[in-house]
Amino acid sequence: MGASPSRPLEQSPSSSEGENHRVKYASYTTQGFRPHMEDALAVELDLDATTSFFGVYDGHGGAEVAMYCAKRFHTMLLEDVDYINNLPNAITSVCFRLDDDLQRSNEWRESLNPCANRNCLTNICANLHHFTEDYVPPSYEGSTACVVIIRGNQIIVGNVGDSRCVLSKNGQAISLSFDHKPHHEAERERIQRAGGHVFLQRILGMLATSRAIGDFAYKQNRNMPPSQQMVTCVPDIRVENITDDTEFLVIASDGVWDGMRNNNVVQFVRQELRPGEENLRETCEKLVGHCLHSNDNATAILVKFKPIEEDPDEVASARDEHQHNPEGGDEKLDINNDND
């Protein structure tokens, strides 16, 4: 059946929090009632001076693919040629690069468990031929990836699989991702064209998500490109503008969304974040705890947006223009020129 599942991880619930000039965040992750932990997350508040990164990775068949995604996704993003000018392209490129790493050799797994002694390099060199010739990619181990990049006045979301991102705008729940499930029409048609079928809402009766990093047992049709395999790593991309009514977003694994609908999550968080009672870490923990009856690992990142600050240079420029043209005619001066 291919590579055996990675060694299960058992861990206590963990949380983190932080902030910069744009956002505040908190995260919480728990193994729940599952025997092993296969979720992973990554947060880089300042990936660069203008960019924040958040990612949730829900593993299946083992934890190591999710762990590798959490370790490498944002670093690969920084390295991508489209990182500065075309983040949607960069996100897509990273998804395929991760798949390539997993297919090529065992080096990705070695990077998660570096040798602790000086014989490490010797051992790797001695086994390099074995890795490249006889290495078996993770056949039934894979991971979702739901990543959120905040840059300037935009939120860019890339999603592979059934983890999810939901935004609250003035109390309205806005889905910023699409759950890739085998029973959805477009996904089912691709699966069937690649030679598969959907049974009990799973691919071949086994896999409950139709897009993932890894899972190479479902990517074996030599007549199809990677984007048209039964399981593909092609992400859906969504770009949303940040406006004055943008409140917060939640990125979470399906252990959360299986327990609560989007609107319920938004209302739950809004209730917890009442003015004067704001505690993001506690709110995130309560949200995940509320969903533990789903019997799955559960991971959530809560990102709260700070009020949009006016650009001092833009305000000064607008003020000067107004002073030069005090009458202004019928034209209204808008010093908060947000592009929606």
Curated annotation (Swiss-Prot):
Binding site for Mn(2+) 1: 58-59
Record keyword Transmembrane present: no
Chain sites annotated for binding Mn(2+) 2: 58, 254, 296
Single annotated GO MF: metal ion binding
Residue segments, region Disordered: 1-21, 311-340
Keyword Metal-binding found: yes
Catalysis performed (reactions): O-phospho-L-seryl-[protein] + H2O = L-seryl-[protein] + phosphate; O-phospho-L-threonyl-[protein] + H2O = L-threonyl-[protein] + phosphate
Domain PPM-type phosphatase: residue ranges: 24-305
Protein name: Probable protein phosphatase 2C 21
